[in-house]
Swiss-Prot record:
The gene is RPL34B. The keyword RNA-binding does not apply. This is Large ribosomal subunit protein eL34. It comes from Candida albicans (strain SC5314 / ATCC MYA-2876). Disulfide bonds: none annotated. InterPro entries: Ribosomal_eL34, Ribosomal_eL34_C_sf, Ribosomal_eL34_CS. The keyword Ribosomal protein applies. Its main location: cytoplasm.
Amino acid sequence: MAQRVTYRRRNPYNTRSNKIKVVKTPGGKLVAQHVKKAASRVKCGDCGSALAGISTLRPRQYAQVSKTHKTVQRAYGGSRCANCVKERIVRAFLIEEQKIVKRVLKEQQDKEKKAAKKTGKK
């Protein structure tokens, strides 16, 4: 009959955080080794693609690694991918340009109205 293996921690249930791997020791015994959950890649907040240059760790482990493992040297580094940052910059620039054009057109209309009022009075 096969040797039985028991959990080594207090939780007796087969949950996602209590997974085990059965391993044979050099002495021939079967023992349970608790397996850590697999880490997932950090994703871009806009498009959801995996971020390059950032370590793949469990959330708690990010506190124990240096800042260079968690970010890249760019605006929104470690939060957004390069393509989304580029899009944001272009969008912000175009919005500012639109505001300037709107302001210039409004000033021109005001000048035309004032000129029309002056010619109407004479």
